[in-house]
Amino acid sequence: MKIAILGSSGFLGKVILKKALDEGFQIRTLVRNPEKLGELKDKVEFCHGCVTKIDKLEETVKGVEAVISTIGPPMKKCEDPEYYKNSMEKIVTVLEKQKIKRYIHIGGAAHLGGENENWTIGRITLRLVLKIIAKPVLIAKQLEWDVLKKSNLDWTLVRPPGIMKEVFKGKGVIADEKNLVRTKINVEDLADFIIEQITSKDWIKKAPLVAAG
């Protein structure tokens, strides 16, 4: 099965890329700087460019069956949330045009969801901290989600809390639409969960809160 990954050179993206390769997926990825892929560069097809360029998006997703995106606003440099909304609109347009249904995007546990979600102290704290240090990030991720909800894609918006290298007690990932059971998650476990969503139908058109099990 061939998939595309947008944002494969970052902290989470590299882990997803490596694990997907280990599981036998063929991968094409869109990167601004292929050298950031390190030794993985020679194991994937890559398109050199930016997600805001329609032609590069079309080249990246041509012939794939699913797309994973970790692209999002950096914590310290998100000055224009509309930029990320526009990027999401372009992604949706290209995928719908090429009839690629499955799309998995990474959001965050601090973002607003459904009316029945439970706001624990830990989750409220996450949101308050982001409002103070990176309010444009919250706005950008909310705008991305608004675009997704209006699309015809079989999307899943994965909402993790703090992503850590640290290994936690317990096992795997707990995913829930209403509850965030912890404020941290191991990056390897998160990557496993995201890759599982490529073929899973459990969370289509949903936005699970995910945390360490």
Locations of regions flagged by a protein language model:
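Conserved beta-loop-beta element that borders a ligand/cofactor-binding pocket
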Residues: 145-166
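N-terminal Rossmann NAD(P)H-binding glycine-rich loop of SDR-like oxidoreductase domains
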Residues: 3-23
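Glycine/proline-rich active-site loop of Rossmann-fold NAD(P)-dependent oxidoreductases
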Residues: 167-172, 197-206
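Core catalytic loop region at the nicotinamide-binding pocket of NAD(P)H-dependent oxidoreductases
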Residues: 155, 200-213
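Conserved SDR Rossmann-fold cofactor-binding beta-strand/turn motif
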Residues: 31, 107, 159-162
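Substrate-positioning beta->alpha
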Residues: 84-85, 139-140, 158, 182-195, ...
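Conserved Rossmann-fold NAD(P)-dependent oxidoreductase catalytic core, especially the SDR/UDP-sugar
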Residues: 34, 90-136, 144
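NAD(P)H-binding glycine-rich loop region in Rossmannoid oxidoreductase-like domains
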Residues: 4, 35-90, 94-97, 198-199
